[in-house]
């Protein structure tokens, strides 16, 4: 091992990560990685700012469920503001030359973002489950005060989950991905715990919640007497599908990296040499790319967000104040009770993600 370098598998990091020591690659590889990062940063920043502004401006989007959506957008913004630009700099310089402190902060914020994202996605799934499957208790469970407390709890748990990395020494520079990140080979037991509590367990909870919702949706749609039986509004079903797609994309983007980490933790000496570099790098940049997808999904699948996006862009282009409330029509001022169920005689309008 070089005295001033880090091992290829990311097991050792000196106090000051060097610029040299990154693997030599064809120019098109680094160009591709840089392009992916630039696209991710730009779309992440613009998209998630649009999400936050949309909820701020539109009363129809200001509800308990969307508090978690804003929290998720903040988690995605974190990486676009600090860690990803540093990774991009590392790509351009073919190595890390920003020092030990920036390496640790970058790795910490990257972990904070991903754990915050999965915990917020779990919070959204539980919220949707209560909203659709336990609608009579929803107002009490998800009052404005309670919802803010839930989001606060999510971020407290996120910080608690990431802090041990600072003491275990697992935040290290890996030249293969030009990033200071969680080193999977530092401790097998710790890596297994991270994968289980930060990925597998949340995914299991979210899967359970959405499975129960799908079962209810199928049961409701098969009922033969709609006059007496409640049915799910199409609007609520579309909102559920939106958040389900967000979950599926997160799971797909992050699963390869987590399964690689699990395999490395089980048998590091055997697995590490067998993992192709292209697979390892692809799994990381696939995970990085996920941070810019949610805002796109909201715009594609949610009509309220799509309309608000357009209003914000028009306001910006015409130099109007885009921080003002855009909910001016009479329908927007009607405060409706959130409930996913309606009958033929009693329709309830709901506007949420």
From Swiss-Prot:
One Gene Ontology molecular-function label: hormone binding
Gene Ontology process terms (BP): adenylate cyclase-inhibiting G protein-coupled receptor signaling pathway; G protein-coupled receptor signaling pathway; negative regulation of D-glucose import; negative regulation of glycolytic process
Physiological role: High affinity receptor for melatonin. The activity of this receptor is mediated by pertussis toxin sensitive G proteins that inhibits adenylate cyclase activity.
CC terms in the record's Gene Ontology section: plasma membrane; receptor complex
Entry keyword annotation includes Membrane: yes
Glycosylated residues (UniProt): 4, 9
Tissues where this protein is expressed: Expressed in optic tectum and retina, less in neostriatum, hypothalamus and thalamus.
Disulfide bonding pattern of the chain: 103-180
Regions that span the bilayer: 33-53, 67-87, 106-126, 146-166, 191-211, 244-264, 278-298
Official protein name in the record: Melatonin receptor type 1A
Region (Disordered): 1-26
InterPro entries noted in UniProt: GPCR_Rhodpsn, GPCR_Rhodpsn_7TM, Mel_1A/1B_rcpt, Melatonin_rcpt
Keyword 4Fe-4S: no
Organism: Gallus gallus (Chicken)
Keywords per UniProt: Cell membrane, Disulfide bond, G-protein coupled receptor, Glycoprotein, Membrane, Receptor, Transducer, Transmembrane, Transmembrane helix
């Amino acid at each position: 091992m070089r005295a001033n370098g880090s091992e290829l598998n990311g097991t050792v990091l000196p106090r000051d990560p060097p610029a040299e020591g990154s693997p030599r690659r064809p120019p098109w590889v680094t160009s591709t990685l840089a392009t992916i990062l630039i696209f991710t940063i730009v779309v992440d920043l613009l998209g998630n700012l649009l999400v936050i502004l949309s909820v701020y401006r539109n009363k129809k989007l200001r509800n308990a469920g969307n508090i978690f959506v804003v929290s998720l957008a903040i988690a995605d913004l974190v990486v676009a503001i600090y860690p990803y630009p540093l990774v991009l700099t590392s790509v351009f310089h073919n190595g890390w030359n920003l020092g030990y402190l920036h390496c640790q902060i970058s790795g910490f914020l990257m972990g904070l973002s991903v754990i915050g994202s999965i915990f917020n996605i779990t919070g959204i799934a539980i919220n949707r489950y209560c909203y659709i499957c336990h609608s009579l208790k929803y107002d009490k469970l998800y009052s404005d005060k309670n919802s803010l407390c839930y989001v606060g709890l999510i971020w407290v748990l996120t910080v608690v989950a990431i802090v041990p990395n600072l003491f275990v020494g697992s935040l290290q520079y890996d030249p293969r991905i030009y990033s200071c990140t969680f080193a999977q080979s530092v401790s097998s037991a710790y890596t297994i715990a991270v994968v289980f509590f930060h990925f597998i367990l949340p995914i299991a909870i979210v899967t359970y919640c959405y499975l129960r919702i799908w079962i209810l949706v199928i049961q409701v749609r098969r009922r033969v007497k709609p006059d007496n039986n409640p049915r799910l509004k199409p609007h609520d079903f579309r909102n559920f599908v939106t958040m389900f797609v967000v979950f599926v994309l997160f799971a797909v983007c992050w699963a390869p990296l987590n399964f690689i980490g699990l395999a490395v933790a089980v048998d590091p000496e055997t697995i590490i040499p067998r993992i192709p570099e292209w697979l390892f790098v692809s799994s990381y940049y696939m995970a990085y790319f996920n941070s810019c997808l949610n805002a796109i999904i909201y715009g594609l699948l949610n009509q309220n967000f799509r309309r608000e996006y357009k209003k914000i862009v028009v306001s910006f282009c015409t130099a109007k104040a885009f921080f003002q409330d855009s909910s001016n029509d009479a329908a927007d001022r009607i405060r409706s009770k959130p409930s996913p169920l309606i009958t033929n005689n009693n329709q309830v309008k709901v506007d949420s993600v």
